[in-house]
A protein has these predicted regions:
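Secretory/extracellular carbohydrate-interaction modules
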Residues: 64-178
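Short, aromatic/His-centered strand-loop micro-motif at the edge of beta-sheets
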Residues: 156-212
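Short tryptophan-centered beta-strand motifs in secreted/extracellular beta-sheet-rich domains
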Residues: 101, 207-217, 223-225
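Short, solvent-exposed beta-strand-to-loop segments that form ligand-recognition rims
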Residues: 220, 226-241
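Beta-strand-rich interaction surfaces with strong enrichment in secreted/lumenal proteins
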Residues: 5-6, 87-93, 195-203
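Extracellular glycan-recognition surfaces and repeat-rich motifs
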Residues: 24-74
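Ligand-recognition surfaces built from glycine- and aromatic
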Residues: 2-23, 110, 157, 169, ...
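Predominantly extracellular/luminal carbohydrate-interaction, adhesion, and secreted-enzyme modules
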Residues: 29-32, 81-82, 235-241
Length: 241
């Protein structure tokens, strides 16, 4: 771990250090809420599948492997316009303090044809689903995404989401609700959020990008994000509640 950690800038205590050569490290499928029948699940959540451990195989020269090993966590979508997928890791916290998420990521379509296909991936992002520990505390859900392309055109900008969608009941027992907070509507542009991310000239190449996200659990506010060499001040950006 000592050498592997050098590519990150962690806070004082490391809660989770995920090396996917060791397995899924707690990451799994985000299953939509349901009651009594799977048919009661919101249709937009029914498309979610379990992530894969991938060595990034491709047809022209073999396998890329991960950033610094063999396996990466692959969150795959179906080859259908508008499809999406999410992987989730569920943790509770011991102290309401500043937390930091760091990871290296890459995104690309499957190389099924001899075309670059650089606008086939719509977006990639992350979110937290946090519960204020106070008795009357809010559910706070910071959402961040990189909008790579839209309608076949490059966009390449960071966005956030603060508007909560309508909550609907699930089943008949009155115990379960759902809301599609991952929907494509109501995303807002991050100020000065345009960023070009490196993309290679043939469809099988990948490039890894660094991302850091800081959040304060005490105040339940976003603080800062860094992607590669760009740093974004998020202190005035609202989270979904």
């Amino acid at each position: 771990m000592e050498t592997s950690i050098n590519k990150y800038d962690p806070l004082k205590r490391i809660i989770s250090f995920d090396d996917f050569d060791r397995g899924f490290c707690g990451w799994g499928q985000l299953v939509g809420n349901y009651e009594q029948s799977l048919d009661s699940m919101n249709p937009n959540y029914q498309q979610h599948t379990h992530p894969q451990l991938s060595n990034l195989s491709h047809w022209d020269s073999g396998s890329h492997g991960s950033w610094d090993g063999t396996y990466a966590l692959k969150i795959q979508t179906r080859p259908i316009t508008g499809s999406r997928n999410v992987s989730v890791k569920r943790l509770t916290f011991r102290k309401a303090s500043r937390i930091r998420l760091e990871f290296y990521f890459t995104f690309k379509p499957e190389a099924t044809e001899l075309l670059l296909s650089e606008t086939d991936v719509r977006s990639v992002g992350f979110l937290f689903d946090l519960q204020d520990p106070q008795e009357s505390g809010n559910r706070v859900m910071p959402h961040i995404r990189f909008l790579n392309a839209e309608n076949g055109e490059h966009v390449q900008k960071w966005q956030f989401k603060r508007k909560a969608p309508e909550v609907t009941p699930v089943g008949t027992d009155g115990k379960t609700i759902t809301h599609d907070h991952l929907a494509s509507e109501d995303w807002e542009d991050l100020p000065n959020g345009h960023q070009k991310l490196c993309y290679n000239e043939i469809p099988t190449k990948v490039n890894w990008h660094y991302l850091r996200f800081d959040f304060d659990l005490a105040s339940m506010h976003m603080k800062e994000m860094q992607c590669n060499d760009r740093v974004f001040d998020l202190s005035q950006i609202e989270s979904m509640k």
